[in-house]
């Protein structure tokens, strides 16, 4: 009887592990989990997320659901998740795209991202372009240094790159993930059980698409 119970318990464990593995090794489908697009972008980033600091789901993906973290943990060492800001959203959209370019150039994008999200969506104390600069002041970047970086050629090029890709890839919502310039992920198609499952499913889908032959 004891042996019989142990066998049953073992079989149940194997079954549960099998079901769990199946959930994360499913065959993702075009038209359901992602859309095949035909963009004219030359040398698109392998993986890019379009977002806005005004976007509630974007904030959740970055800070609560931890989608970005789950994806970064699974990427090869020589690949990164690019994040491009959408200027068309909100009254400070263009200024925020510029701020994001400055943050990336200065290497403080990881810190600036959280502060800008909180300032716009939690504290709601970012009302003007000057308020955006004050976020950088908190990180030790003076207003003069910020103004200097605004005029930097590389910063201007990054702003143009973001705006250009938004237009050419026909980005109509955020957060939007594009893989290899060819696949647009359908966020709503992923597992909705809980935050961890959703983030893991997104990371799996990203890897699935990265490994698809072009």
Protein language model features and the residues they cover:
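A structural motif
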Residues: 104-111, 135-142, 179
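A short beta-strand-turn-helix
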Residues: 28-46
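N-terminal secretory signal peptides that target proteins for export/translocation
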Residues: 1-6
């Amino acid at each position: 009887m004891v042996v019989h119970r142990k066998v049953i318990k073992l079989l149940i464990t194997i079954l549960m592990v099998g079901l769990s593995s199946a959930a994360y090794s499913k065959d993702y489908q075009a038209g359901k989990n992602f859309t095949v697009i035909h963009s004219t972008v030359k040398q698109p980033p392998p993986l890019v997320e379009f977002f806005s600091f005004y976007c509630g789901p974007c904030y959740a993906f970055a800070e609560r659901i931890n989608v970005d973290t789950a994806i970064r943990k699974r990427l090869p060492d020589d690949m990164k998740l690019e994040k491009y800001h959408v200027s068309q959203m909100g009254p400070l959209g263009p200024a925020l795209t510029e701020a994001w370019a400055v943050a990336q150039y200065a290497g403080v994008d990881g810190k600036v991202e959280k502060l800008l999200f909180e300032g716009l969506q939690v504290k709601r104390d970012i009302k003007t372009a000057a308020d955006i600069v004050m976020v950088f002041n908190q990180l030790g970047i003076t207003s003069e240094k910020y103004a200097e970086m605004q005029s930097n050629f590389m910063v201007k090029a990054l702003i143009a790159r973001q705006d250009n890709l938004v237009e050419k890839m026909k980005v109509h919502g955020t957060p939007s993930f594009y893989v290899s310039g060819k696949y647009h992920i359908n966020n709503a198609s992923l597992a909705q059980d809980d935050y961890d499952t959703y983030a893991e499913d997104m990371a799996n889908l990203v890897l699935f698409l990265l490994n698809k032959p072009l």
